[in-house]
Amino acid sequence: MEDDQDEEQTALVCDNGSGLVKAGFPGDAPPRAVFPLTVGRPRHQGVMVGMGQKDSYVGDEAQSKRGILTLKYPIEHGIITNWDNMEKIWHHTFYNELRVAPEEHPVLLTEAPLNPKANREKMTQIMFETFNVPAMYVAIQAVLSLYASGRTTGIVLDSGDGVSHNVPIYEGYALPHAIMRLDLAGRDLTDYLMKILTERGYSFVTTAEREIVRDIKEKLCYVALDFEQEMATAASSSSLEKSYELPDGQVITIGNERFRCPETLFQPSFIGMESSGVHETTYNSIMKCDIDIRKDLYANNVLSGGTTMYPGIADRMQKEITALAPSTMKSKIIAPPERKYSVWIGASILASLSTFQQMWITKQEYDESGPSIVHRKCF
């Protein structure tokens, strides 16, 4: 059949996080296009006379012009909230970043765990009706991270810019009743670091300065194995201090802020949240699962997402889970070095599997059944 050959075209893989878009073709390492998931619109119409001003800017261009723009993030806490802006981001991804015609490629998208049904339908509709894709599929981010680690059973802590989730997965299927969501992630940690650096006498307030603080966070922060002990060390010596050069040449020194910032993941009360830390949510999620599979979950505890990149986080997690779990349980934390991109890598693996090729939702199926087809084919 002629049509079947057509379906063999290279897939496009697009992972939309709250902070970054990761997009490309299966086999790319790292993903070909990584850019901020943001849309900027001019604050004042007609300010830039004669500069061929556009009504909107996407991604890196929006970031670089942020002085004259209002930046909007169409994904909040992992869930798409502004479809017009999201469409702009997909358009930018296909036409400007990857330079492909979406009508010629099947597209694999990712979604947050517990994504509302209406949202999945809307994603499906936009892909087929706006971008005319020949086929598409929507996969859950945490499940893809687990695949990327070479497993089909385990529990994933996926923490990005806007949201963190604990997702227990058994033989490839997420267990929705036991998923934990924590609205605490990279963006909150950047905000908290801005706050505690201000207490030290440095002032970071604007969106431009926020980017600097994010860089400080990514380069210098780490998770302490024992927070109290680390605080004592920091108080009694300067061994933990590091310096950082700002763009204007000023050098700042950062001490206990280096580990106080990510400690928030384990003690959300630092930023006034009444939630459990990521170690407790992991434990609670496992406890909501059938007693027979808990052993497999403890033994396959996979970290994923940019906010799990802090040095020391795996050891600390191991220590905390061991303290919570029954003494007979062997717990193991898996922290793959490429975990910043593991959702994307898992999606890229999935799209390449020969067994996956019959899973795509085709244009024909969409035309016959409408957007609700997504619930039957993607789960």
Swiss-Prot record:
Coiled coil: none annotated. Its EC number is 3.6.4.-. The keyword Hydrolase applies. Keywords: ATP-binding, Cytoplasm, Cytoskeleton, Hydrolase, Muscle protein, Nucleotide-binding. Gene3D superfamilies: 3.30.420.40, Actin, Chain A, domain 4. SUPFAM superfamilies: Actin-like ATPase domain. It is found in: Cytoplasm, Cytoskeleton. GO terms for cellular component: cytoplasm; cytoskeleton. It catalyses: ATP + H2O = ADP + phosphate + H(+). GO terms for molecular function: ATP binding; hydrolase activity. The keyword Nucleotide-binding applies. Actins are highly conserved proteins that are involved in various types of cell motility and are ubiquitously expressed in all eukaryotic cells. Belongs to the actin family. Polymerization of globular actin (G-actin) leads to a structural filament (F-actin) in the form of a two-stranded helix. Each actin can bind to 4 others. This is Actin, muscle. It comes from Styela plicata. The lineage of its organism: Eukaryota, Metazoa, Chordata, Tunicata, Ascidiacea.
